[in-house]
Amino acid sequence: MNQPLQHTTVLLDEAVHALLGDGDAPAGTFVDGTFGRGGHSRLILQRLGPQGRLVAFDKDTEAIQAAARITDARFSIRHQGFSHLGELPAASVSGVLLDLGVSSPQIDDPQRGFSFRFDGPLDMRMDTTRGQSVAEWLADAETAQIAEVIRDYGEERFAGPIAKAIVARRTERGPIASTAELADIVAGAVKTREPGQNPATRTFQALRIFINAELEELQQALEGSLHVLRPGGRLVVISFHSLEDRIVKQFIAQHSKEVYDRRAPFAPPQPMRLRALERIKPSTDEVAANARARSAVMRVAERTEVPA
């Protein structure tokens, strides 16, 4: 029987150091865009000065409940996705941390429906109080829509056969309601398997990303960070798959260079608004201790003096 895993925060010390810098007890306002179970937030609060502030965001009601146990007056949390961080005052934040993806408590709770390893309701919503579940969406989606989601968000080469198999099963037996049923359908449609990977891995990833609009929220959060970060403020993002990392990498690259307007070739360029600092992968020891760290990539950038 699979046992739920205790959540271990990936790149904990590296991320907090990148966010706060080398100074002792920094002041300023910092943002933890993904509170989760509070691994990063608690360490930030330990190292933050008495005048510092930490604002956390999370869509998950269980994360909000966990955050309620923090009684530190310097801490506050908002029951919102990190796409709302841009609503903070302009140039008011000294650092933004985004730890993307799903936490172990979410993955390992069968009732959340994130994992093919446990049989449970096919939900996958980060915020269970709003929006469609995966089961509800699959009940009405067309074959082409399902294939597009699985292909674009899961980078799954068997997206077409999987989508056809889902619709065929739905037509024959009614709506697909459980993770086990979906995993069984996918396994039957995927003819070759990648070594060490369950055939349902990419499909489950794709549906989770789609149903939670994860990539759109990430793009909004990155844009929002330009608005709220003060000059010298840090942007720290930990991603866990290539789609996320590509967005972060391209965003930092786009804003780390001068931009010329082709329609006005003699106009001065728009100066860069970010300075790329580093890219960090977990150590061999961390990956050995926490298998979920193996795909993590952390990118760090610094806000320049240029106004948003």
UniProtKB/Swiss-Prot annotation:
Gene Ontology cellular component terms for the protein in this record: cytoplasm
Key words, A-Z: Cytoplasm, Methyltransferase, rRNA processing, S-adenosyl-L-methionine, Transferase
UniProt cross-references to Pfam families, sorted A to Z: Methyltransf_5 (PF01795)
Family matches, as InterPro entries: RsmH, SAM-dep_MeTrfase_MraW_recog, SAM-dependent_MTases_sf
Gene Ontology biological process: rRNA base methylation
Matching SUPFAM superfamilies: Putative methyltransferase TM0872, insert domain, S-adenosyl-L-methionine-dependent methyltransferases
Reaction equation(s) it catalyzes: cytidine(1402) in 16S rRNA + S-adenosyl-L-methionine = N(4)-methylcytidine(1402) in 16S rRNA + S-adenosyl-L-homocysteine + H(+)
Keyword Transcription part of the UniProt annotation: no
Localization annotation: Cytoplasm
EC number: 2.1.1.199
Annotated GO MF terms: rRNA (cytosine-N4-)-methyltransferase activity
UniProt binding sites for S-adenosyl-L-methionine: 38-40, 58, 82, 99, 106
HAMAP family, alphabetized: 16SrRNA_methyltr_H
Family membership noted in the UniProt record: Belongs to the methyltransferase superfamily. RsmH family.
Its job: Specifically methylates the N4 position of cytidine in position 1402 (C1402) of 16S rRNA.
The protein, known as: Ribosomal RNA small subunit methyltransferase H
Species this chain originates from: Acidovorax sp. (strain JS42)
Species classification: Bacteria, Pseudomonadati, Pseudomonadota, Betaproteobacteria, Burkholderiales
